[in-house]
């Protein structure tokens, strides 16, 4: 194996990049001396170039660009695209020895040497790792956690600490945003459950200026803000937390990948973006057509209680 080429999905959102991180980590774990080249359509080079496991980033816009990115001497090609025939054809023309891709009842299914069936009911980050496991078995959950532990390592002693991390963002629009007012009500209920000394950290991005102003105006000593913090620092924050509660947004996938006790709040069931595990829970409106803010703080509190009880039981048992 001389070089590993990874075609990431043609999606510019932060969450789409974060769910690819454990895949890149695992590839570098297997082949530490080999170059990893990430190829993408979108302008996401700054994200991937900052990673310790990526040696080169190539932005491609045409079929020719993609084809040139896969050299004849490339030993491994991993396609994280779910349905494009383009990447099967590129692999057919270049024929790297190891060709990994998703099966989805297309003719390109025949081209992969190792594959995993695409299923929209499976968390996308888990699916990426199961694709790799078709080549060599490993524990996807352990690999994901180790990935974010590796990113977090420089920040583990200095990152902000909180019992509960709350992520009220939602870059896709208001329909994905359970309101800040609801998060504050939930925080008050969680204090009754966890104790008056419970500390909360709100993770905010550029789009949450209104939420930032509102939180600062509250002057609550139990509330802190992490604004526009880098992914390695947020990884350390999530790994320290007793609980993470989040809307369906990019940073939520740091918490899910880090295997933190997690409650996700969704406007509708969205299993492709929620990693279903015993220490995680998804909350959706009883009638999705009524909108995300019909979810009450008590609805979310019930999910938090279940996740916390399971996590405490596992911690005690271990």
Walk through the language-model features, giving the residues of each.
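Catalytic machinery of carbohydrate-active enzymes
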Residues: 1-318
């Amino acid at each position: 194996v001389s070089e590993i080429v990874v075609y990431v999905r043609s999606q510019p959102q932060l969450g789409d990049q974060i769910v690819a991180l454990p895949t890149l980590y695992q590839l570098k774990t297997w082949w530490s001396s080999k170059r990893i080249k990430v190829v993408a359509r979108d302008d996401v080079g700054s994200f991937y170039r900052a990673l310790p496991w990526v040696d080169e980033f190539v932005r491609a816009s045409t079929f020719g660009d993609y084809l040139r990115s896969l050299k004849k001497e490339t030993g491994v090609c991993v396609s994280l695209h779910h349905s494009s025939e383009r990447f099967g054809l590129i692999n057919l023309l270049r024929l790297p020895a190891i060709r990994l891709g998703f099966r989805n009842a297309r003719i390109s299914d025949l081209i992969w040497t190792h594959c995993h069936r695409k299923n929209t009911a499976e968390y996308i980050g888990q699916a990426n790792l199961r694709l790799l496991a078709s080549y060599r078995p490993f524990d996807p959950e352990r690999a994901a956690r180790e990935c974010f532990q590796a990113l977090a390592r420089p920040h583990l002693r200095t990152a902000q600490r909180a019992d509960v991390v709350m992520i009220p963002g939602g870059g896709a629009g208001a329909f994905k945003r359970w309101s800040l007012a609801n998060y504050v009500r939930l925080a008050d209920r969680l204090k009754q459950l966890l104790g008056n000394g419970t500390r909360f950290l709100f993770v905010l991005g550029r789009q949450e200026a209104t939420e930032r102003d509102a939180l600062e105006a509250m002057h609550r000593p139990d509330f802190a803000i992490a604004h526009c913090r880098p992914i390695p620092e947020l990884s350390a924050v999530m790994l320290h937390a007793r609980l993470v509660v989040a809307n369906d947004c990019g940073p939520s996938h740091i918490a899910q990948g880090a295997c933190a006790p997690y409650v996700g709040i969704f406007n509708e069931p969205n299993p492709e973006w929620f990693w279903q595990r015993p220490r995680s829970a998804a909350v959706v409106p009883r009638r999705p057509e009524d909108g995300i803010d019909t979810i009450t703080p008590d609805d979310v509190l019930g999910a938090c209680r279940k996740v916390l009880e399971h996590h405490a039981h596992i911690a005690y048992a271990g």
